[in-house]
Swiss-Prot record:
Domain of life: Eukaryota
Organism field: Saccharomyces cerevisiae (strain ATCC 204508 / S288c) (Baker's yeast)
Pathway in which this enzyme or protein is active: Porphyrin-containing compound metabolism; siroheme biosynthesis; siroheme from sirohydrochlorin: step 1/1; Porphyrin-containing compound metabolism; siroheme biosynthesis; sirohydrochlorin from precorrin-2: step 1/1
Name this protein carries in UniProt: Siroheme biosynthesis protein MET8
Keywords: Lyase, Multifunctional enzyme, NAD, Oxidoreductase, Porphyrin biosynthesis
Catalytic residue positions: 141 (proton acceptor)
Biological function: Catalyzes the conversion of precorrin-2 into siroheme. This reaction consist of the NAD-dependent oxidation of precorrin-2 into sirohydrochlorin and its subsequent ferrochelation into siroheme.
The EC number(s) this enzyme carries: 1.3.1.76, 4.99.1.4
GN (gene name): MET8
Length: 274
C-alpha cells in the first residue's frame, strides 16, 4: 500500500478556494479559517452558521457597496488573525473563478464540497489541466479525486495537534480513534501538555543560538531528542529552560559535544522548576 504523507501545512495568507457552502463546506471552514488562510468561498447558498461564524461582513448593510443582489463580497477588514472568510461569491461555480488578478499568484488548495459529483470531477480535472498536476485539489466524498485528506483532529491547547487519518476510507472511524486518544489523555490527568510544548520550543530556540553552525545541527537534534526522552511526557512541562541551556553549553563546549546526561533522578531534581 502507498502511504500518505502527513504534514502540518502553514496556510497563513495563502489563497484557498472552497466551492460549496453547505454542511460539508462548514466543516472545512472550521478547519481552514483558524489557519489564517485567505479563503474564497463560492456557493449560491450558505449554511445558516457560516455568516454569523465566519462572514459577518457579507450582510453588513453599513458597507458602501452593499446590495441585496450582490454576487461578490470582499471582506474590507480581512486579517489572518480574525478568523473570517476573505471573499464570498454568491453563485454556482464558473470556470472564470479560477482566475486570479495577480498572474504571479496561485491557489494553494482548491476544494469542492457540492452534491453534483460530475461537476466536482470536471472541476478537479479543469484545475489539473490549468495549473498542472502539482495543484492540490480535494473533492469531498471522492477519495480518488483527493490529493490530500481531511483527518480527525485532536487539539490540546493552541500548539499541540494530533491528526488521525484513515486515508479517506472511514472518516467516522478516525473520529472514534481520536476520541479514544482524548479519553486516554483525560485519564492520565493534567500533564500540562501545551506548557510542555512551549517550554521545549524555548529550549530548542536557545540551543540553536548556542550552537548556530550548520555542522552542529545533528548534535543539537540528538541532544534535544535525548533530553526530551529523559523528562518524558510527565515532566517536560516542568523543565527549567535556563538551567538546561547552561547544561547544554557545558556538554557542547566543555565536554566536546557529549550526549552523556546526568542520571534521570538528578535531572528531575535539579533541572525542573521548583
Amino acid at each position: 500500500m502507498v502511504k500518505s504523507l502527513q504534514l502540518a501545512h502553514q496556510l497563513k495568507d495563502k489563497k484557498i478556494l472552497l466551492i460549496g457552502g453547505g454542511e460539508v463546506g462548514l466543516t472545512r471552514l472550521y478547519k481552514l479559517i483558524p489557519t489564517g488562510c485567505k479563503l474564497t468561498l463560492v456557493s449560491p447558498d450558505l449554511h445558516k452558521s457560516i455568516i454569523p461564524k465566519f462572514g459577518k461582513f457579507i450582510q453588513n448593510e453599513d458597507q458602501p457597496d452593499y446590495r441585496e443582489d450582490a454576487k461578490r463580497f470582499i471582506n474590507p477588514n480581512w486579517d489572518p488573525t480574525k478568523n473570517e472568510i476573505y471573499e464570498y461569491i454568491r453563485s454556482d461555480f464558473k470556470d472564470e473563478y479560477l482566475d486570479l488578478e495577480d498572474e504571479n499568484d496561485a491557489w494553494y488548495i482548491i476544494m469542492t464540497c457540492i452534491p453534483d459529483h460530475p461537476e466536482s470531477a470536471r472541476i478537479y480535472h479543469l484545475c489539473k489541466e490549468r495549473f498542472g498536476k502539482q495543484q492540490l485539489v480535494n473533492v469531498a466524498d471522492k477519495p480518488d479525486l483527493c490529493d490530500f485528506y481531511f483527518g480527525a483532529n485532536l487539539e490540546i491547547g493552541d500548539r499541540l495537534q494530533i491528526l488521525i487519518s484513515t486515508n479517506g476510507l472511514s472518516p467516522r472511524f478516525g473520529a472514534l480513534v481520536r476520541d479514544e486518544i482524548r479519553n486516554l489523555f483525560t485519564q492520565m490527568g493534567d500533564l500540562a501538555l501545551e506548557d510542555a510544548v512551549v517550554k521545549l520550543g524555548e529550549l530548542r530556540r536557545g540551543i540553536r543560538l548556542l550552537a548556530p553552525d550548520d555542522k552542529d545541527v545533528k548534535y543539537r537534534m540528538d541532544w534535544a531528542r535525548r533530553c526530551t526522552d529523559l523528562f518524558g511526557i510527565q515532566h517536560c512541562h516542568n523543565i527549567d529552560v535556563k538551567r538546561l541551556l547552561d547544561l547544554f553549553k557545558v556538554m557542547f563546549q566543555e565536554q566536546n559535544c557529549s550526549l552523556q546526561f546526568p542520571p534521570r533522578e538528578r535531572l528531575l531534581s535539579e533541572y525542573c522548576s521548583s
